[in-house]
Amino acid sequence: MKAFLKILMVLIFVSVAYAKSPPTLSKEEEVLQHLQSFSAHFKQVLKNEKPLVYYGVLKAKAPNWALWVYEKPLKKEIYMNDKEVVIYEPNLFQATITPLKDKTDFFTILKRLKKQDDGSFKTTINKTTYRLVFKDGKPFSLEFKDGMNNLVTITFSQAEINPTIADEIFVFKPKDENIDIVRQ
């Protein structure tokens, strides 16, 4: 009986020693897995016949809030949550509210990304492929093709991982009472 127990113990030890260890996550995968908020300045380039360049600030918070504040060349604010998108254009005195049909908010995109052989991360949501590249352990650029087949590249700078962001900034509150609100 003792010999049987010794053999059993050796077999258990060998099986444990040779068991596959769980895959270790890369630094970038760890960031994506634990990301609860994100803040960065951005440069957005829309490549078509005549490239358009926009600058602004992004604030995003899990589970699905995002605020894109475009500062140049035109001012615009885009508020996103899991239900709707509000596009406020102060120069036009107008806010357009559209239901969010597809889960294409910032965090849904980030949570669905899969690491590629080249080190980038990709996901496809409703026929749109998103590609994220990290630099210095932080999201650096996000690329995708828009509905008109234009390549959009968003480059992040001054990125902060998990900063404290107040929930209130994600709620659209008109700064001017005389704006038109269009519901689509």
UniProtKB/Swiss-Prot annotation:
Q: Where does the record locate the signal sequence feature?
A: 1-19
Q: Can you tell which superkingdom this protein's organism belongs to?
A: Bacteria
NCBIfam families per UniProt:
PRK00031.2-1 (NF000663)
Q: Is the keyword Signal assigned to this protein?
A: yes
Please provide the Gene Ontology terms (biological process) for this protein: lipoprotein transport
Q: Which family does it belong to?
A: Belongs to the LolA family.
Which named protein is this?
A: Outer-membrane lipoprotein carrier protein
Q: What are the alphabetically sorted keywords of the record?
A: Chaperone, Periplasm, Protein transport, Signal, Transport
- Mention any Pfam family matching this sequence: LolA
Subunit info here reads:
Monomer.
Main localization (coarse): periplasm
Question: A cellular component term (GO) from this record?
Answer: periplasmic space
Q: Which gene encodes it?
A: lolA
UniProt subcellular location: Periplasm
Q: What is the lineage of its organism?
A: Bacteria, Pseudomonadati, Campylobacterota, Epsilonproteobacteria, Campylobacterales
Query: InterPro entries in the record, alphabetically?
Result: LolA/LolB/LppX (IPR029046), OM_lipoprot_carrier_LolA-like (IPR004564), OM_lipoprot_carrier_LolA_Pbac (IPR018323)
* Gene source species: Helicobacter pylori (strain P12)
What does this protein's UniProt record list under function? Participates in the translocation of lipoproteins from the inner membrane to the outer membrane. Only forms a complex with a lipoprotein if the residue after the N-terminal Cys is not an aspartate (The Asp acts as a targeting signal to indicate that the lipoprotein should stay in the inner membrane).
